[in-house]
Amino acid sequence: AMSSRLPSTRPTTRRERIKRDEAIKHRDDIFLDKNSPTKFEFDSGVAEVFDDMLERSVPLYRECQNLTVNWCKRLATPDKYIYDLGCSTGSLLLLLTKSIPTIPRVHLIGVDNSAAMINKARNKLSNFPDSVGFVKANLDDSFLFNDSCAIVMNYTLQFIPVENRAPLLKKIYESLMPGGGFILNEKVLSEHELLSETFVEMHHDFKKGHGYSKMEISKKRDALENVLVPLKLSKTMALVREAGFTTVDIFFKWNNFAGLIA
């Protein structure tokens, strides 16, 4: 039979089998389950599959991360701090540790309010114990920054209550040294009602192309309702300017995803 001549797709070596099993273990199937959460939370279940979730849910995620690293490299200053606010599993911090070892005494700090995410990040960066510090904290009035050369928010501001965004951005502005920079990657709304739904549909097509079912996409959208609250890009840029930043520009855009440098 013809099928018998087809090459086997089964993993042949032990290393390949381990890699396959790891991929299955860390694959995002949270919204496949009929008992999937009705409200999205950054708990241990999400932390376990979060890297896969980002890769399959955020268009051009790696390219955007690399752009962010390049900005941080340009802004990195000895004896100053680079903060990743909402660091999740520490993927950006891992890239940074590999990219800026030549700049002495730059302090990398990951901040997240999810203990599960912080634990995952600590494990991921266990080979770099002296390079990165972690803080479990909410980004509210009580959080204090050290003198910063760069502050990054990767798809984090969209989860902050809208009324708390302006004071947080003001605090970020005041924490940056002269010449420091703020890098903001964010899900946004179209400026035009007519295009908004098309952007959403194209994003759903992207997810389908990365293995998510229609049901998973729908259930996740419902779970994120009032948890992830995107604004129009013009509104977010206005908030950044009102915080004190005089130079604000878009360095990345994919339909309803944008990257800002300020």
Predicted features and spans:
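Conserved alpha-helix/loop element of class I SAM-dependent methyltransferases that forms part
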Residues: 60-79
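Class I SAM-dependent methyltransferase Rossmann-like catalytic core
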Residues: 36-39, 44-64
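C-terminal alpha-helical "lid/dimerization" subdomain adjacent to the S-adenosyl-L-methionine
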Residues: 188-241
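Class I SAM-dependent methyltransferase SAM/SAH-binding core
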Residues: 81-83, 90-141
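A short glycine-rich, Lys/Arg-flanked "PGG" loop and its adjoining helix->strand segment in the class I
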Residues: 166-178
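Conserved beta-strand signature within the Rossmann-like core of class I S-adenosyl-L-methionine
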Residues: 179-187
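N-terminal auxiliary segments of SAM/dcSAM-dependent transferases
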Residues: 14-38
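A conserved beta-strand element that flanks and buttresses the S-adenosyl-L-methionine
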Residues: 152
